[in-house]
Amino acid sequence: HDGFTLNDIVSYNTKHNIENGEGNCDGNDNNVSWNCGQEGTTSDENIIELREQQMRNLFTLLMISQGTPMFLYGDEVKFSKNGNNNTYCHDNKLNWFDWSLYRKNKRFFNFCKNMIEFRKSHPVLRRATFFNGINSDEYCSSDISWHGFEIGKPDWSENSHCIAFMLNGNKAVTGADLNDNN
């Protein structure tokens, strides 16, 4: 699969495809990534912790999003392709899976495993239909509601730094065998 790994999304601002032999002209230039203050690997503990937090944020967002979650092999153990987002031509460590990463990054692996279990245990996160946000007397509230600093008042402006949402886990809404409002 083309594109940055999860680890590379938080470690590189730009692609590093020089080793591909195409003058870094291959691969997408729009990676929607942020290196957290330093390009590539670092020993700066503050940057490392920020990157790990960003990876947890991104993985959480993926697990609470509707649809089928898709991530790249190795994302759960912080696999990196060193900023190369187009490794089609490599039969080397850029594409070989490093099994030692499970031991090295056990904390992040366990976080990912727990988030997958969380998703599996909450039917409201695996709906068969899209949200519509319409209030229904039958369910007492809409399937999704949006909030800001005040309940029921989301601020969609670009200066807002707070957004929250609530999902209705009523089994009649989710179509699941059990209520998910706990």
Please provide the spans of the model-predicted regions.
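Active-site and adjacent substrate-binding regions of carbohydrate-active enzymes
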Residues: 2-182
